[in-house]
Amino acid sequence: MNDVHNFNAGPAALPKQALERAQKELVNFDGTGMSVMELSHRGDTYDRIHTHAIKKIRKLLDVPDDYHILFLQGGASLQFPMVPMNFLDSQATYILTGAWSEKALAEAKHFGKTVIGASGKDGNYKQIPALNQISEHAQDSYVHMTSNNTIYGTQWHAFPNTKAPLVCDMSSDIFSRRIPVNQFGLIYAGAQKNLGPSGVTLVLIQDAFLQRAKSGLPAMLSYDTFVKSNSLYNTPPVFSIYMLGLVLDWLEESGGLTEIENRNKAKAQLLYEAIDESDGFYIGHAAQDSRSNMNVTFTLANDALTSVFLQEAKEAGFVGLNGHRSVGGLRASIYNAVPYASCEALVDFMKQFKNKHAEKGATV
């Protein structure tokens, strides 16, 4: 089958160079006569893979020395309860910007008092709250936020300076841009958007914040367990970590975060211009100042054309353009590995579709 234009929301497109290298090394890794998936996680060969991935993360994100880099499992969904289990004392503040922050809040409620510091729910999550709208409280154990909202297509373009440690779910935009790591107490991210295949969850945790963690927790749910064991307390997701390292090799060879950020902005601008210049045929969901550079969400003025759009797009070689099941519409996820050429091709298709169906999709 020929290559497709992959706009899946996650698992998402991976760099072809990383996939081809994995293919080449799949059966016999580094002369061992074994696949990466067959290596002992206690052996020297895997240790080099593990260490390589950690070093790449620290270098590319400019992670300060007082931050621990962990590889966990369970996805961001396990981090939703794990964060409050370890750190929620008197109360925690949650900033709501979409479905994933709502899920994080729901899990935190099992472990203690929570308050909402700001919310975009009343506006159907079309806009990120202004920094000066965020309410903090002296008794906060931490403040939790979600940096990018895949379902609604919104993204924080600046982060709040909070008095309590800031915890952030960066699953869908980590490594898509430069970030001030030292502004956060803890960052977590599932891998399957920008880091590699699913199966591993990256956690960055400041040592000073770690010292506040509760003791007496189940070993597998304690961050301290994985800090002390270098994420080798139990068998890690070896292949996922290996792939993460290959993806970061590609990222570095592509020019690092500055270059990839510029590419991502250019891809997003191309798509948003096509939406804005469609005379109302396409309607963007997110407010302009909150638009995501990772997930471009939009609808058709004539909703009856949505299924037609998806079918014709599929026939033209585009996949993953359906909106999330909870909101419908359309969504183009343009993570790091999605080429600019795919975005150009999508824009051309959108224009052709509009010209073909303009009478049915009357402007609003």
From Swiss-Prot:
GO biological process, one term: L-serine biosynthetic process
Gene Ontology CC terms: cytoplasm
EC number: 2.6.1.52
Subcellular location: Cytoplasm
Record pathway: Amino-acid biosynthesis; L-serine biosynthesis; L-serine from 3-phospho-D-glycerate: step 2/3
Oligomeric and partner information: Homodimer.
Role, per record: Catalyzes the reversible conversion of 3-phosphohydroxypyruvate to phosphoserine and of 3-hydroxy-2-oxo-4-phosphonooxybutanoate to phosphohydroxythreonine.
Disulfide bonds: none
Cofactor note: Binds 1 pyridoxal phosphate per subunit.
Protein name: Phosphoserine aminotransferase
Family: Belongs to the class-V pyridoxal-phosphate-dependent aminotransferase family. SerC subfamily.
Species for this entry: Shouchella clausii (strain KSM-K16) (Alkalihalobacillus clausii)
Keywords from the UniProt entry: Amino-acid biosynthesis, Aminotransferase, Cytoplasm, Pyridoxal phosphate, Serine biosynthesis, Transferase
Residue numbers of N6-(pyridoxal phosphate)lysine PTMs: 193
